[in-house]
């Protein structure tokens, strides 16, 4: 039997879970939701009542009526709670002993263990959150940058839901026109057709804008990836260490010291930057080094930013020119920063070759002479360039789709609009109506996936137990 969304009924059984990470800390939170949540909280605290939305300082008692902890207990009555059910939270002392003991007491008093994401699932089924807001919650839990949080908070506040509803209303207006005139399509005046085409073009432009701007700004959500490339011993690991301000990679005069990619995280202007120090690119018979070079090329493919380092104290050789060819042919849609290292020594390389290369590149940043020392000197210019890249995307008030599911829904809606234009041009109003209906369905799936619940099950399974 197909698992449809209509078959998913809001379950009022009482669930319990620890909502905070397990381990040593100031507090742990045990969360309850369901019909017995309030009565279980009263049994735990020996209170006759709990005032809604107030923090009550209480002792927590075990089955032998002995106090096992002191905690703050909060009660949120339905429907004005996260799950739209009665919800109680017990904020006990941190660590694992108290929280686990309280969970066991709740189980004995009639609760069951919550499944992963079950609290958020109940919030969705109860109408507290739409699917876009649920995905925003999941994104906030996994977020690794402040800029991503800002985007996800817009989605959590309901901005995407508002956009979906507005688009749906515009499409319904277009659909109503076509439905009325289906039986008299030969008699429809051209002015009405032009009016519908204009309204549909407006919807198409809005959807196309949000789709393409979301594609170009996924790095804000997922983080930027920067790969440092160059032949062996040109200063790649020195740059990584300088950016991180500590000795992460071994720096040696021996060529080929870095044989594998090294990845580290850095936050710039509120955005996450994954820095990949790659193995030097050169011809090699060493099998291990060959694997490292292959990983370097794979890192290039998934990077947004490439920092290419060349040794300015030596003339360019075949390996340098091979790297230039990679920049020219494989990195056209990536930001490129070129560093001519060892600028403290007399310049021997053909600097003009690099300038000519960057002039042909649509996302070239800068070609700079630099002296990368073990004292982390000279890195400020590099940081300024990286801040410039991040700043071009951050701070934009445009709404951004934050998941591949949302992007796919918009893409399918745009495909329906293209087909709708085509059949409208030849006067096929019935086929036009079908395409508009499909378009509405695709748009609405962003917030309310009516077809089946498997997507929801997969999504909620990615949540932690207490969310």
From Swiss-Prot:
Cofactor(s) named in the record: K(+)
Cross-referenced InterPro entries: G_TrmE, GTP-bd, GTP-bd_TrmE_N, GTPase_MnmE, MnmE_dom2, MnmE_helical, P-loop_NTPase, Small_GTP-bd
EC number: 3.6.-.-
Biological process, per Gene Ontology: tRNA methylation; tRNA wobble uridine modification
Chain sites annotated for binding (6S)-5-formyl-5,6,7,8-tetrahydrofolate: 31, 89, 128, 467
Positions that bind GTP: 233-238, 252-258, 277-280
Limits of the TrmE-type G domain: 223-391
Free-text comment on the cofactor: Binds 1 potassium ion per subunit.
GO MF terms held by the record: GTP binding; GTPase activity; metal ion binding
Keywords of the record: Cytoplasm, GTP-binding, Hydrolase, Magnesium, Metal-binding, Nucleotide-binding, Potassium, tRNA processing
Keyword match Metal-binding: yes
Compartments where found: Cytoplasm
Entry binding sites for K(+): 233, 252, 254, 257
CDD domains noted in UniProt: trmE (cd04164), TrmE_N (cd14858)
Binding site for Mg(2+): 237, 258
Gene Ontology CC entries for this record: cytosol
Function of the protein: Exhibits a very high intrinsic GTPase hydrolysis rate. Involved in the addition of a carboxymethylaminomethyl (cmnm) group at the wobble position (U34) of certain tRNAs, forming tRNA-cmnm(5)s(2)U34.
Family matches, as NCBIfam families: mnmE_trmE_thdF, small_GTP
Subunit structure: Homodimer. Heterotetramer of two MnmE and two MnmG subunits.
Family per similarity comment: Belongs to the TRAFAC class TrmE-Era-EngA-EngB-Septin-like GTPase superfamily. TrmE GTPase family.
Protein name: tRNA modification GTPase MnmE
Organism: Helicobacter hepaticus (strain ATCC 51449 / 3B1)
Gene: mnmE
